[in-house]
Design a protein with these regions (language model features):
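Metallo-beta-lactamase
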Residues: 5-9, 102-144
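Active-site environment of divalent metal-dependent phosphoester hydrolases
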Residues: 21, 81-86, 108-111
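Active-site metal-binding motif and surrounding structural segment of the metallo-beta-lactamase
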Residues: 44, 55-102
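Short catalytic-loop micro-motif centered on adjacent basic/acidic residues
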Residues: 47-50, 75-78, 139-142
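Short glycine-/acidic-enriched loop or helix-start segments at secondary-structure transitions
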Residues: 23-24, 60, 88-89, 112-113
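Conserved beta-strand hairpin/beta-sheet module of binuclear metal-dependent hydrolase folds
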Residues: 4-68
Length: 144
């Protein structure tokens, strides 16, 4: 059963909640677990922003599949490759191999080192680069 939330017109939260964890990154106490935030934009092109930790992978994939409702996934934006953002990259690309990955040059390098296969290729973006997906244009920023 999917568990999604409409955030705005054509933008959906497709992440998942994990109530099992007591510590984030084995350091920071969690009283109510953690939320893995991933968003899906339905525009002229479909765009998935981040994935989720593999511990919630099944729920995450159900959410994405439900919102896509048979549409192809055109792009996967990976903000960085820590497991809470990118652990399900391989599974997403197995389900939607036509999806092109958009990420930073460093994240692209790490994806290759981690052995992720990206059949449709990688579009590397730098500070201030923009990508238009139809009605929505995204500006990419670097953050520590």
């Amino acid at each position: 059963m999917d568990c999604v939330r409409k955030v705005a017109d054509n933008l959906y939260w497709v992440g998942a909640n994990d109530h099992r964890l007591a510590l984030f990154e084995n350091i920071h106490p969690l009283t109510c677990g953690i939320s893995y935030n991933s968003y899906l934009l339905l525009d002229e092109k479909t765009v998935l922003f981040d994935t989720a930790d593999w511990s919630v992978g099944r729920q995450f994939l159900e959410n994405v599949t439900a919102v896509l409702a048979g549409k192809p996934l055109d792009y996967l934006v990976i903000n960085h490759v820590e497991p809470d953002h990118a652990a399900s990259v391989g599974e997403v690309l197995r389900h939607w191999p036509q999806a092109k990955v958009i990420t930073s040059p460093k994240a692209a390098q790490l994806l290759a080192q981690f052995g992720f296969s990206v059949p449709a290729g990688i579009d590397t973006v730098h500070e201030g680069d923009k990508r238009c997906f139809g009605q929505h244009t995204v500006t990419f920023l670097s953050a520590p």
